[in-house]
Structures are given as structure tokens and as C-alpha cells.
Design a protein with these regions (language model features):
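Flexible, compositionally biased loop and terminal segments
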Residues: 1-226
């Protein structure tokens, strides 16, 4: 049984290039795809946790100011739509924002993020996590800093100091866009996850594509390193 799926949303910019569009038009197409996908997950599956790699810390630091500004606008529109979606309340979905998103310069976006966190904090049926300004090595580094005065450190101690302390291990990690790497996503929590890579660029990733990944997972035998 799948409890937790992680999804690396990759391929927006290549999709825009393929269709002779501007990079931010690819991000907007990805936003619309994500809306369809999350609604499908929320209403049509029994998977409790879905974690989305929306913006890496590396991309936040290195992308051009213009692209980031337009990306923030796309994120804001997406979260406003999510905030007003009745499905959040109906399915009791809690929204978590994970990473150093306090670094975001866009005050309106941060306001929306704080609002959606507050509005859904008591929901307990499903958990939808957005990783923004996140990097797995940075997460572990920050955990180490928190443990500087701890005398006996165990795996549980480390987990309890991670940004993802309230999330279970990832069962299935999906990456769209054709790349075969983790790019720093949830490094501690994907240690025994099944990995599924697809060449489909994220704006073209459909609920059917999502189900194909789940079917592939169910056909595998998990060994957990044994």
C-alpha cells in the first residue's frame, strides 16, 4: 500500500521551448497541470501524503530575476486557487510548505502561503506538501545545527530535527522530464523509496501518467535494502 508519494516537477522550461513559448509560460502550463493532478490525488486515491518539489533552493538562488518574479506570480495564482478550492475542506487536506520559503522576496506570495497553512492546520485526512526554496543537503545541515548540544544522536533524533519531521518515509518517488537524479529532494526520506523516472515533461503529465507510475510501483517487490 502506498502511503507517501514524492513528485519532482521537472520539464516546464523544456516544454515551453518545445512549443516556442517563453519559460514562464511553461511554468503556467505546469501550474494548470498540477491543479488537475492534485485534485485527482485528493478525490480519487487513498494515498494520504503527496509531496511536491516546487522550487529548489538552487533554482531560487540562480534563476534570473525576471523568471523568478513571473514564477512567484504563477505560484501565487496557484495557491489562491487552492485556498478557494472547496475540496480542501471536503477532503480535509492539510497544506504544508517546507523549505526556506521565508527567503522569498514576494510579500503577497508569502501572505498567501501563511494563510493556506493557517486555514488547513487542523485538517487531518490528507497532507499536501509543497517544497519551496528547499534542498535536501541544506535540510540535513540545519538538522545538524539543531543537534549541536545533543549527546546521543540516533536516526530518530535526526528525523525529529528535519523539516520533514512530520512526514513518513517516501514509498514512491516520481520524476518527470527525463532526468534520472534526485536533485536534492528529500534525501533522508527517500532512502528506500521506489524510483520512477519518465520522459514526460511535467505540463504533459496527466492523472493517467500518475496511475501508470503507481501501477509500476505495485508490480515491484520492495526489498528495503535486503
Amino acid at each position: 500500500m502506498i502511503k507517501h508519494i514524492g513528485l519532482i516537477l521537472d520539464g516546464n522550461r523544456r516544454w515551453s521551448k518545445k512549443h516556442a513559448l517563453k519559460p514562464w509560460e511553461g511554468h503556467e502550463a505546469g501550474r494548470l497541470t498540477l491543479s488537475i493532478l492534485t485534485r485527482y490525488w485528493a478525490s480519487k486515491t487513498d494515498i494520504k501524503y503527496l509531496s511536491l518539489y516546487a522550487l529548489s533552493l538552487k533554482n531560487f538562488l540562480e534563476r534570473s530575476s525576471l523568471e523568478k518574479k513571473l514564477l512567484y506570480g504563477s505560484l501565487e495564482r496557484g495557491f489562491i486557487d487552492l485556498l478557494n478550492d472547496k475540496l480542501l475542506k471536503k477532503e480535509k487536506i492539510r497544506i504544508k510548505i517546507i523549505g526556506k520559503w521565508n527567503l522569498l522576496p514576494d510579500k503577497r506570495l508569502k501572505k498567501v502561503l501563511n494563510e493556506i497553512i493557517s486555514k488547513t492546520k487542523k485538517h487531518n485526512k490528507k497532507v499536501l506538501s509543497f517544497f519551496i526554496c528547499y534542498d535536501g543537503q541544506d535540510e540535513i545541515t540545519e538538522a545538524a545545527k539543531e543537534m549541536k548540544n545533543v549527546q546521543r544522536i540516533t536516526r530518530s533524533t535526526i528525523k525529529n530535527n528535519l523539516f520533514t519531521k512530520d512526514l513518513p518515509p517516501v514509498d514512491l518517488l516520481i520524476r518527470t522530464g527525463g532526468e534520472h537524479r534526485l536533485s536534492g529532494f528529500m534525501l533522508w526520506d527517500v532512502s528506500y523509496a521506489e524510483l520512477y523516472f519518465t520522459d514526460i515533461l511535467f505540463p504533459d503529465f496527466t492523472p493517467s501518467s500518475f496511475n501508470n507510475a503507481i501501477t509500476e510501483y505495485k508490480n515491484r517487490k520492495r526489498r528495503f535494502g535486503k
